[in-house]
Every structure is written in structure tokens, then in C-alpha cells.
Curated annotation (Swiss-Prot):
Belongs to the universal ribosomal protein uS9 family. The keyword Ribosomal protein applies. PROSITE patterns: RIBOSOMAL_S9. Keywords: Ribonucleoprotein, Ribosomal protein. InterPro entries: Ribosomal_Su5_D2-typ_SF, Ribosomal_uS9, Ribosomal_uS9_bac/plastid, Ribosomal_uS9_CS, Ribsml_uS5_D2-typ_fold_subgr. NCBIfam families: PRK00132.1. The keyword Glycosyltransferase does not apply. GO terms for molecular function: RNA binding; structural constituent of ribosome. GO terms for biological process: translation. This is Small ribosomal subunit protein uS9. GO terms for cellular component: cytoplasm; small ribosomal subunit. Residues 140-154 have a biased composition (Basic residues). It holds the Pfam family Ribosomal_S9.
Length: 154
């Protein structure tokens, strides 16, 4: 059995190993997806003035709760890009809390796609962690996932 050891890398292989140079953001939108509970959010960020649009409505109209608005804006505020990008979001499924969490994750992922240097700050703040908690399924013989019917001794 003979062993062949390559001492030189072929030119085409060297090109394949070279890091891929990213094109500057320019005017192209960045698209990402965020999920939480049953909610799925598709986000496009484009250079702009800081407007956030959810299903064609302003953020304040779609999420009247100040808590949800703050949650959604946190990644933009952390990276100091709240006035730099416009966010266009398509939200489907779930409730308001799930949609707000999914939107926050999608915005954080989009910010990393536009500026990879922001990753440590977003990671430290916990904006890149996908919350894996979902509704527990109902079991037969029980009224809900864990709630048992009332017990009668006699």
C-alpha cells in the first residue's frame, strides 16, 4: 500500500480554500428568518431611517405593548443601528409574545449578516439564542399536558 502526500496545493484548490470576500451591503436587502413558539418571521433589512414595518403596519400599531416594542428594538439599540436600517417584517402564526421574540431573533441575525463584527455584542446580550421552549403536547387520560381530572376517593 502506497501513501501519497501532497506537498503543494493545486491553484484551483487554493482558491477554494481562500475566505470568501463579502460584498458591501450597498442597496441590497438582507433577508433572515426567526422562530419562537409557533411564530415564524421573515425579515428584510434595507438601509434607511429606522422604520419598522410589520405585515404592512407600523411597529406601534402592530405591537401596542411597550414591552414588545422594547424587546424588538433591543438588537438595533445594542448595535447602535436603530436609525441606520429599515426593517420590513412578515409575521405568521403564534401570538404576540412569540411573534415579538421571533422578530427580535430575525433582526439580530440580519444585523450579523450586514456587519459580522456585531456578533460578540449580540451574542453576549442573548439575542442570537433561539428559544427552544414550545407548548407541551396533551396526553391521553389527562385534561391538558399535565392536568389530571379531579380525583374522587369514593
Amino acid at each position: 500500500m502506497t501513501d501519497i502526500i501532497a506537498t503543494e496545493v493545486a491553484p484551483e484548490a487554493a482558491e477554494a480554500l481562500a475566505p470568501v470576500a463579502r460584498a458591501p451591503l450597498g442597496d441590497r436587502p438582507i433577508q433572515t428568518v426567526g422562530r419562537r413558539k409557533e411564530a415564524i418571521v421573515r425579515v428584510r433589512i434595507v438601509p434607511g431611517s429606522g422604520r419598522i414595518t410589520c405585515n404592512g403596519r407600523e411597529l406601534e400599531a402592530y405591537f401596542p405593548s411597550k414591552v414588545h416594542q422594547q424587546l424588538i428594538k433591543d438588537p438595533l439599540v445594542t448595535t447602535e443601528k436603530a436609525e441606520t436600517f429599515d426593517v420590513i417584517a412578515n409575521l405568521r402564526g403564534g401570538g404576540t409574545t412569540g411573534q415579538a421574540g421571533a422578530l427580535r431573533l430575525a433582526i439580530a441575525r440580519a444585523l450579523i449578516a450586514s456587519e459580522p463584527d456585531d456578533r460578540p455584542a449580540l451574542k453576549k446580550a442573548g439575542f442570537l439564542t433561539r428559544d427552544a421552549r414550545v407548548k407541551e403536547s396533551k396526553k391521553y387520560g389527562l385534561k391538558k399536558a399535565r392536568k389530571a381530572p379531579q380525583y374522587s376517593k369514593r
